[in-house]
UniProtKB/Swiss-Prot annotation:
This protein's name: ATP-dependent RNA helicase DBP5
Coiled coil: none
Ranges for domain Helicase ATP-binding: 122-293
Uppermost EC category: hydrolase
UniProt source species: Ajellomyces capsulatus (strain NAm1 / WU24) (Darling's disease fungus)
Bias-annotated ranges (Polar residues): 24-39
Record-listed ATP binding positions: S135, Q136, S137, G138, T139, G140, K141, T142
Gene Ontology MF term list: ATP binding; ATP hydrolysis activity; RNA binding; RNA helicase activity
GO BP term, pick one: mRNA transport
Location of the motif DEAD box: 240-243
């Protein structure tokens, strides 16, 4: 069985290539330019946006963050990164338009997170400078680049329909989520429209007429080639989950081709929780002379996520344990990550046969059906979602209290003599819980010595603790997990105002 995500190819050669050949996937996606406007009369709620790093119900940015150091490397080597100009303690210090501040406050943002403290002054500075930004999952990266976008829009009658900002995401689910954040944060910005450019079942051939466009690289490329999307007025391009976008075969090629069609002076913003060393080199070429905000990889794991592992006797025993886990999975919402599409389908079939309510979503599910599944999960109609790495990154469903690594994530390395852990994907997977200071549980199933060794490698890489729980004592398993989830629901890590 083939794994869900292909291995990344040598990107340096692709970036240096003057005229990359057309990748079939760039034109095989039917395109749409769906445009949604935020009328003043009906403001979307924070829940509608599934916002990254804020929710009225959870206290927004009043949550405490763990201690970690944010390293700033300025493109101007003569500048002092400790200068107060490069760090703010309140959104009001940024000189934002009142309509943008009003949107922030409606989302319960009260003060910037650490990534926002450092990133926003650099993003909003003029003349615009490129940025490569890294921070822990669930700390408000999306909000940071959305604020920058909203602050740079010209919504005068002459420009209100001209695309001025482009956000590229690796999946339709993340693209739709980002659209929701922009709509909520910009709900008080008059005349704001957001266009979505993601694969659909039918090609509507609509012209893109919105100042903000969010989409997947292949679809955006298709729209530009068909002259349905005029990029000449674009001021900023954002790559969310940038390391994945640049390093993955196909996606990286498409991002490079899209950028080649944009204005040369465009502001390039790259954000992700992870930037492996080999990707940083390529990112520096994609976003030259960028200000950089980075963390040590030992500081990337989120403190609020309790990491556990269970010894399983075999792959079949994994399923037996998963069935036992169902009662714990539905206390909040849970995501189960597996290696292949076939595994996701088979586990869903067997759990449904056991009488359990679950849904699965993989890259093999098309367009509208994918939207229906993720919306059902967001709304709580289904509390357990089985998926592959297609949803490992960026997806923010605030009710998720548990992540299960049914299969330990591993790198696709055909010539390797042993299985190699994918530490970056592990971090992104478990980051679907513990969002913005909340508590979550990440449980990994281990059924072989190789899987155990991969988990040990992940533990060493991040310098983190992954506690073993005895599957022979189910009372202990339930007590450990329930205690953590109860502490999350009670808001034990909230900082009350």
């Amino acid at each position: 069985m083939a794994t869900e995500t292909p291995a990344g190819g040598p990107l340096e050669a692709r970036i240096s290539r003057a005229e990359p050949k057309t990748d079939a996937s760039a034109t095989s996606e039917p395109a749409t330019g769906d445009t949604t406007e935020t009328p003043a009369a009906t403001k979307p709620s924070a829940a509608d946006g599934q916002t990254d790093g804020a929710s009225e119900g959870f206290g927004g940015s009043q949550l405490q963050e763990p201690e970690y150091s944010v390293n700033v490397k300025l493109s101007d080597l003569q500048a002092d990164p400790n200068n107060p100009l490069y760090s703010i303690k309140s959104f009001e210090e940024l000189g934002l338009h009142p309509s943008i501040l009003q949107g922030l406050h409606s989302m319960s943002f009260r003060r910037p997170s650490k990534i926002q403290e450092k990133a926003l002054p650099l993003l909003l500075n003029n003349p615009p400078a490129n940025m490569i930004g890294q921070s822990q999952s669930g700390t408000g990266k999306t909000a940071a680049f959305v604020l920058n976008i909203l602050s740079r829009l010209d919504l005068s009658p002459q420009m209100e329909l001209a695309p001025q900002a482009l956000v590229l995401a690796p999946s339709r689910e993340l693209a739709r989520q980002i659209v929701g954040v922009i709509q909520v944060m910009g709900s008080y910005v008059d005349k704001l429209k957001v266009a979505t450019a993601v694969p659909m079942e039918s090609n509507r051939n609509q012209k893109v007429e919105a100042p903000v466009v969010v989409g997947t690289p292949g679809t955006v490329m298709d729209l530009i080639r068909k002259r349905l999307f005029n990029p000449q007025h674009l001021k900023v391009i954002v790559l969310d989950e940038a390391d994945n976008m640049l390093d993955q075969q196909g996606l990286g090629d498409q991002c490079i081709r899209v950028k080649g069609l944009l204005p040369k002076n465009i502001q390039v913003v790259l954000f992700s929780a992870t930037f492996p060393d080999h990707v940083v080199r390529y990112a520096n070429k994609f976003a030259p002379n960028a200000n950089q905000i980075t963390l040590k990889h030992e500081e990337l794991t989120v403190e609020g996520i309790k990491q556990l592992y269970l010894d399983c006797d075999s792959d079949e025993h994994k399923f037996d344990i998963l069935v036992k886990f169902y009662g714990l999975l539905t206390i909040g919402s849970s995501i189960i990550f597996v290696k292949t599409r076939a595994s996701a389908v088979e586990i869903e079939r067997r759990m449904v046969a056991e009488g359990h309510t679950v849904v699965s979503l993989t890259g093999g599910v098309e367009g509208q059906k994918r939207d229906e599944i993720i919306d059902k999960f967001r709304q709580g109609d289904a509390k357990v979602l089985i998926t592959t790495n297609v949803l490992a990154r960026g997806i923010d469903v605030q009710t998720v209290s548990m992540v299960i690594n049914y299969d330990i994530p591993e790198l696709h390395a055909p010539k390797a003599t042993k299985r190699i852990a994918d530490a970056q994907t592990y971090l992104h997977r478990i980051g679907r819980t513990g969002r913005f200071g909340r508590v979550g549980v990440a449980v990994s199933f281990v059924a072989s010595k190789e899987e155990w060794q991969m988990l040990q490698d992940i533990k060493t890489y991040f310098n983190t603790e992954i506690q073993r729980v005895n599957t022979q004592d189910w009372d202990e398993v339930e007590e450990v997990v329930k205690t953590i989830i109860r502490s999350s629901r009670a808001g034990s890590n909230f900082q009350r105002s």
